[in-house]
Each structure stands twice: as structure tokens, then as C-alpha cells.
């Protein structure tokens, strides 16, 4: 925490002197600072940091959309998580919806670069929808994320395995809360992508009681 706080102070000073050069560094350091606060269980401080980061990235993305729209989308996703952590679920949903919409546009342009990010943001939206008592919509969001991620998981199992497991668990939680039937084909594909042995793969993502 001390290191990220020092980084924010450092980049804030430089951004005041040369905003064009260092505002992106300040925004990035604020996102990191927010993540640290979140990990330490200090959600109000995490929210303040991520909110400032989003405000900075909005300006940057308006000036140079190709360079900074991905940063804005990621920061909005973090902001949504921070809002949810303090009970501001409707605002959290709005932030994650904006992140999802931006990532959809980015993934349409550069699918290999941004489809995993889109899948991650869909998982975040699912968690927030569950918190709002809308589990059927949550299940649909998580399932979409899984379907988008699966082709990339097959190629990059080490890099994307943790994300895939998290999405799988989120999907199952939403399905259970909604009283829906599990899409066993989707879960089977996920298990095989994580582990070629179907049974081992199912256990790896918590999909089997055996």
C-alpha cells in the first residue's frame, strides 16, 4: 500500500507539470492503488481511487480513443466492482455495462487482444446482477463470457485458466440462484478445455461433486 500511495503522489506531481505526458501514468497508478485498497478490505478508499482513475481515463479516451479506450474499459470494470463492494449496486451495474459495451467494440476490432477482457467484464456483470437479485440475467451474462473465452482457453490454458474457473463458478452460482438447468454441454467444454480428462477438468472448476 505504501508503494502504490507513493506512486500516486509521484505521478500526481509529474502530471501537474506535464499532463500530456504523465496523466496516463497517474490514472494507471490510481487503478493499482484502488486494487490494493480492495485487497486490504478498504472498499471506500478503493472506490475513491478507481473513481478518479475513471475520470482521468474518460478525458484521455476522448483525446486518443485508440490508445486509451481499453484503459477506460478496464478502469470502469474495476469501478463497478468497487461500487458493488459499498452496496451501490445499480451504479455498479451501469459502470460494468459501459465496460462490457466498450469491450464489445474493442473485441470486434481486435478479437485476440480483447475478447478475454470482454469475458472478464461479463463475469463481473454477472456477479453484480446476482447482487441485485437478477440471477437469470446473471447466468446469461456468465454463460456468454464462457462461450467467448473457450476458444482462447484452448490455446492459452495457463494464462486464462483462473479466469475460466472463476467464470464457471459464477455461472453455476447464478444458475443455482435462478433455479435454472445447467448447460452441461457448456460445462463439459469448459472442463475439457481446462483438463483433457473430462472428470479431472470438472473437478478443477468445481463442477463435480465426486
Briefly describe each language-model feature range.
Residues 140-142, 181-195:
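Alpha-helical repeat scaffolds
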Residues 1-176:
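A detector of tandem-repeat and repeat-rich interaction/domain scaffolds
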Amino acid at each position: 500500500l505504501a508503494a502504490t500511495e507513493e506512486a500516486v503522489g509521484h505521478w500526481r506531481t509529474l502530471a501537474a507539470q506535464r499532463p500530456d505526458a504523465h496523466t496516463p501514468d497517474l490514472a494507471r497508478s490510481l487503478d493499482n492503488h484502488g486494487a490494493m485498497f480492495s485487497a486490504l478490505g478498504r472498499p471506500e478508499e478503493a472506490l475513491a481511487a478507481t473513481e478518479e482513475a475513471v475520470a482521468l481515463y474518460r478525458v484521455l479516451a476522448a483525446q486518443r480513443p485508440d490508445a486509451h479506450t481499453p484503459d477506460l474499459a478496464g478502469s470502469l470494470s474495476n469501478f463497478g466492482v468497487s461500487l458493488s463492494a459499498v452496496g451501490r449496486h445499480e451504479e455498479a451495474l451501469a459502470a460494468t455495462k459501459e465496460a462490457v459495451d466498450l469491450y464489445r467494440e474493442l473485441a470486434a476490432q481486435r478479437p485476440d487482444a480483447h475478447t478475454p477482457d470482454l469475458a472478464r467484464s461479463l463475469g463481473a456483470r454477472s456477479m453484480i446482477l446476482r447482487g441485485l437479485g437478477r440471477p437469470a440475467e446473471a447466468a446469461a451474462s456468465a454463460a456468454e463470457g464462457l462461450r467467448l473465452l473457450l476458444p482462447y482457453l484452448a490455446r492459452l490454458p495457463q494464462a486464462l485458466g483462473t479466469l475460466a474457473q472463476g467464470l464457471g463458478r459464477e455461472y453455476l452460482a447464478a444458475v443455482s440462484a435462478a433455479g435454472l438447468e445447467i448447460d452441461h454441454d457448456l460445462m463439459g467444454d469448459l472442463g475439457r478445455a481446462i483438463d483433457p480428462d473430462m472428470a479431472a477438468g470438472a473437478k478443477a472448476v468445481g463442477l463435480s461433486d465426486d
